């Protein structure tokens, strides 16, 4: 048994969002050498077409020939860390591609990934987030992150099916006694 990494963007000079087979091979090999046997890398906020390519190549990585299976960490899922996030709490995400939660776009990305998207970060205060969570919580883990959400909005998101937080206390309002936030 080894470690499982569910939030990293890249390593060994490559980024998961490079979306190339070479990047995935290098990332998988590096992670395995570090004792990480299973990975769920996070994407950046990119165009839909680029995200489709990233998703398709991630799926292709899971279908490597048997002889190559032991050369890299097992890719157990994709974490879409955008584009359905808050502009105000975007962090290093590209603002040009930030958009409101869109069920149909997610389904297109999931189709490109052959169902490999396991986790998606959204800002629950954005238009469309409530419907997104309601419709997709039984199909994918929904993570609250890159958000300006207050406590009540976050509570509703978790009540509706969100079940994870992306880098808690980072890219969200600070925790205070009068405004506990996420």
Locate predicted features.
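Conserved phosphate-binding/catalytic loop of the ribokinase/pfkB sugar-kinase fold
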Residues: 86-112
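A glycine- and small-aliphatic-rich helix-loop capping segment at beta-alpha/alpha-beta transitions
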Residues: 19-23, 94-98, 163-164
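Active-site core of metal-dependent hydrolases
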Residues: 111-182
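Charged helix-capping and loop-helix junction motifs
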Residues: 20-23, 54-57, 102-104, 178-182
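Short, electropositive alpha-helical surface patch
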Residues: 51-69, 132-141
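Divalent metal-dependent hydrolysis catalytic cores, especially in the metallo-beta-lactamase
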Residues: 9, 25-54, 72-86, 113-125, ...
